[in-house]
Design a protein with these regions (language model features):
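Modules that initiate DNA replication and primer synthesis
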Residues: 2-143, 173-212
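Intein modules and their embedded homing endonuclease domains
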Residues: 138-287
Length: 287
């Protein structure tokens, strides 16, 4: 990276990084997209304090995000490609911090300073995980249309639920099922996560219904004899199975079991005790 000399080389390095991110590390691409919607006040003239905090947050998340940091810095009108070696050296010399800014900080800044851009990134991220659950069964559905498979695993659906509500809910005790919800600038305890459970049959279910509508609208434009038609039809069938599951008591209970692990924050009580008004939990605002 330190040898990059122009915009074309920088774009090549960046695209190579983004294209090689495995699906299980999609959060790195998501963070790049959040960084990309930060306004000029984070990289333009007089932005040093914010600019350097973006670097700290990226470094605290993953050393692999150096290229994202360089690309972000290059958005400045005063950026000089001859400064890249120095920026790389500065990155390498910064130690990761146990506390302070993180990936959650970047998301918070984006939401505050570019809400429309942050909303688009969030919707794109959720869409990625929704499609993962639908596409996971497509091949087997095409091969065996009469299959009784349920469509997606409980964990996979829990991941989608987590992406939708990771800034609103936290599980503080997996064993006893203690849940908190962030509302009106405070964390409130929610009995057994009942409101999140309800969202499985409402918000999460509606998300899949919307995806089915999109796929159905696309399907009518295809030739029934086309292989693409079969693929899209299989996706619709899989999504419909998921929609049915999201209204079933047993399936909702299983998804909530997976959600406990996904929403769990082992340091939640410590942070809440130290400052009940400080929003510094993994699933809350960090700043």
């Amino acid at each position: 990276i330190s040898t990059i000399k122009n915009a074309e080389e920088l774009d090549l390095y960046l695209q190579r990084f983004l294209e090689t991110i495995p699906s299980h590390e999609y959060q790195l691409k998501e963070l790049y997209e959040y960084v990309n919607v930060l306004p000029e006040s984070y990289y333009g003239a007089g932005s040093y304090a914010k600019w350097i905090r973006v670097m700290w947050a990226l470094k605290n998340t993953s050393n692999r995000l150096l290229i994202v940091w360089i690309a972000f810095s290059a958005k400045s009108s005063t950026f000089n490609y001859s400064d890249i070696p120095e920026l790389c050296e500065d990155w390498d010399n910064r130690e990761k911090r146990d506390s302070g800014v993180s990936n959650r900080s970047i998301i918070y800044w984006a939401k505050n300073d570019n809400p429309d851009g942050a909303k688009a990134v969030r919707e794109n991220t959720i869409g990625f995980y929704v499609d993962n659950t639908i596409n996971s069964m497509t091949a087997s559905s095409i091969a065996n249309p009469s299959s009784n498979t349920k469509g997606a695993g409980d964990y996979d659906l829990g991941v989608v639920l987590h992406q939708m509500f990771k800034d609103e809910y936290v599980c503080s005790d997996v064993k006893n099922g203690h849940w908190f919800r962030y509302r009106r600038h405070r964390w409130h305890e929610i009995d057994s996560g009942t409101t999140l459970r309800k969202s499985i049959s409402t918000d999460l279910r509606e998300l899949y219904k919307s995806r089915v509508t999109e796929l159905q609208n696309y399907l009518v434009s295809l030739d029934p004899e086309d292989e693409k038609y079969k693929s899209v039809k299989a996706k619709i069938d899989t999504a419909m199975k998921i929609i049915l599951r999201l209204g079933q008591t047993a399936d909702k209970s299983n998804i909530m079991k997976e959600a406990k692990d996904l929403f769990y924050d082992e340091e939640f009580y410590d942070r809440l005790d130290s400052n009940p008004y400080l929003l510094c939990c993994k699933n809350g605002v960090i700043d």
